[in-house]
Amino acid sequence: MTAKVRIAVVGASGRMGRTLIESAKQQQVIILGAAIERTGSSLIGIDAGVLAGVGAMNVAITDSLDKVVNDFDVLIDFTSPESSIIHLDWCAKNHKAIVIGTTGFNHAQKEQINAYSEQVPVVLAPNMSVGVNVMWKLLALATEVMGDYTDIEIIEAHHRHKKDAPSGTALKMGEIIAQTLGRDLEQCAVFGREGITGERDPNTIGFATVRAGDIVGEHTAMFADIGERLEITHKASSRMTFANGAMRAAFWLSDQNAGLYDMQQVLGLN
């Protein structure tokens, strides 16, 4: 497929929204077709490119997907779990593909996403960075070799504004490790430790969370044994890596049938 794909960005004025708009302007196969903000926003009518600091793109910010239904092919959503479900419902009714980078979905919301994906193409990924997705492959390999005799801990750090913890990326890391070991993450995860906790259970996967400053995103999986320790780490220095991944996902998704996909499939890693 060589035709350009038109995207829409919801939450256009947010940190990620502005980065997505900036990324879209840099792409050869992506066109920004629409940018959406909440009803009543003072930004309605402003050029999306001007808002993002990249110059005019001739796309005025609007407050309704209905107003721009014919202006895009794929919606990109990095908002909140509740908003993402609303946008997904709209996409299903209007036959639009959607790329979801939102994290923090509960079990019921994940079930809703599964159901909607029977109607439209959906990419759901807790992290759209190419590097993170390669890291997940490395985690599976390390777990196969070392997972049954090492203590496994996952440490993640993000900026002070992040609302969910642990991050979706950290949880995905835990899921990959647990699945490789034949365990259920819900049964073996330990989220933080305090007080007299006793000796470490060797079958657990520990999680530690940091929220501070403007950290874009850092994730480390530690495989610790007596005498040596392997650490697999990814550090993001800019949100642009997530935005560029979302553009890649949108282009790929525009040519897919209804279904639920992830970045491993987008990148051909699975």
Swiss-Prot record:
UniProt cross-references to Pfam families, sorted A to Z: DapB_C, DapB_N
Cellular compartments per GO CC: cytosol
Enzyme class, broadest EC rank: oxidoreductase
EC code(s) of this entry: 1.17.1.8
Keyword Amino-acid biosynthesis: yes
UniProt keyword annotations, A-Z: Amino-acid biosynthesis, Cytoplasm, Diaminopimelate biosynthesis, Lysine biosynthesis, NAD, NADP, Oxidoreductase
Organism: Shewanella frigidimarina (strain NCIMB 400)
Name by which UniProt lists this protein: 4-hydroxy-tetrahydrodipicolinate reductase
GO biological process: diaminopimelate biosynthetic process; lysine biosynthetic process via diaminopimelate
Transmembrane regions listed in the UniProt entry: none
Residues reported in the UniProt entry to bind NAD(+): 11-16, 37, 101-103, 125-128
Cross-referenced InterPro entries: DapB_C, DapB_N, DapB_N_CS, DHDPR_bac, NAD(P)-bd_dom_sf
Location in the cell: Cytoplasm
GO MF annotations, alphabetized: 4-hydroxy-tetrahydrodipicolinate reductase; NAD binding; NADP binding; oxidoreductase activity, acting on CH or CH2 groups, NAD or NADP as acceptor
Primary gene name: dapB
Domain of life: Bacteria
Active site residues of this protein: 158, 162
